[in-house]
Amino acid sequence: MEHIQTRTTLSQLSTLPSDKRLGAIRFKCLLVMKVEMINRIAGVFARRGYNIESLAVGLNKDKALFTIVVSGTERVLQQVMEQLQKLVNVIKVEDLSKEPQVERELMLIKISADPKYRAEVMWLVDVFRAKIVDISDQSLTIEVTGDPGKMVAVQRNLSKFGIREIARTGKIALRREKMGESAPFWRFSAASYPDLEGAMSAGTISRTIKRTPNGESMSMAEGDVYPVETDDNSGVSQVLDAHWGVLNDEDTSGLRSHTLSMLVNDTPGVLNIVTGVFARRGYNIQSLAVGHAEVEGLSRITTVVPGTDESVSKLVQQLYKLVDIHEVRDITHLPFAERELMLIKIAVNAAARRNVLDIASIFRAKAVDVSDHTITLELTGDLHKMVRLQRLLEPYGICEVARTDVWHWYVNQVWIRSTCEDIHTLCSLKSSNLRKIPALCGMCANVDD
């Protein structure tokens, strides 16, 4: 689903008529995911000269939920919505700009941190309710979630230490519920993740029969944003699956998911050009996240595509030929951390609210909006963490889910290796006993936060 929000200044409101006010509008768009769909969506904006400020794509099998922020006048952006709705595979487009909403994005920021300033940095991290996710002798990597205003404040306060690198996901948002009103109820299912479907119990599946807004019953297999396919796809590679491409020792095909990090100019049409390179070569984009970089005028694109090492190497060479590309890195075989941001709205009354909050505290999720019939939670982590929380919340009824794509972050390899060695020495653990999330070194895997 694609979603865009309007932001206008007082000066613009006083000098421009209503149809010519400039602002950033957020669309919510649900579509059937095909190889070329991201390129077609970006092309609608590029042909009209609009620069995409933020893009978040939550993929799941053949469906995708888009959240895009662009700037323009209200009249023209209304025309853009109509053009998006005409695309064959677009199911629904919705503008939530004028609705009260919970808006969040995820930012990873790497700063220079001399040991004598560490105490001050840690104090700022605590003030902004951020987390340290990576550390070395001369740098710290900080994870922070919040609205755009909070992101600006974090950057301003940390800039004096020296910002080395910034990675930001696209913005996601959910509508705030009003007291006394009934929430839209879609009952999203965590079982729609194909590699985790087997763990669903019969009782849980029986509870996922839902009704559409028209009152018609809809089985879970018909799906919404995160559908469950009833077809037997065993033995078939699902290239949109989040964990497709992880090679086993006996896998000789060479296919795997490759993570590419690109630094590009922040100008209209760049995303369309970049995704066009993938589309022309038949690459399906498993994951895509776009956000502002640490340097003004530049954006960072992180994408995941399936392929062999050789074919992706040729793809990187083609990307380097683009004028607006400053840097392309394949970080698949490098140590990196991954994070995803999710907003999830649960239908719950006052009697069950305590139970939901207890579950949220276990997963370190935060309540960001509460009404008399819903709770909206914010959660960061990896895919399995998201799925486990959704499974526990399904019996209460899940109204809406908004997700960023998985954001991959290159970490300090020297520190990770030394830390892993310490863990093995002190705890006498074997690498096979450690929880496996994307590997950070040859000895073991990253530990879930």
Swiss-Prot record:
Pathway: Amino-acid biosynthesis; L-isoleucine biosynthesis; L-isoleucine from 2-oxobutanoate: step 1/4; Amino-acid biosynthesis; L-valine biosynthesis; L-valine from pyruvate: step 1/4. One of its GO terms (cellular component) is chloroplast. Residues 1-30 form a transit peptide. Keywords: Amino-acid biosynthesis, Branched-chain amino acid biosynthesis, Chloroplast, Plastid, Repeat, Transit peptide. It is found in: Plastid, Chloroplast. SUPFAM superfamilies: ACT-like. GO terms for molecular function: acetolactate synthase activity; acetolactate synthase regulator activity. GO terms for biological process: isoleucine biosynthetic process; L-valine biosynthetic process. It holds the Pfam family ACT_AHAS_ss. Residues 31-98, 259-333 form the ACT domain. The keyword Plastid applies. Its main location: plastid. The keyword Cell cycle does not apply. The acetolactate synthase complex contains both large catalytic subunits and small regulatory subunits. Regulatory subunit of acetohydroxy-acid synthase. Probably involved in feedback inhibition by branched-chain amino acids. Not involved in herbicide tolerance. Belongs to the acetolactate synthase small subunit family. This is Acetolactate synthase small subunit 1, chloroplastic.
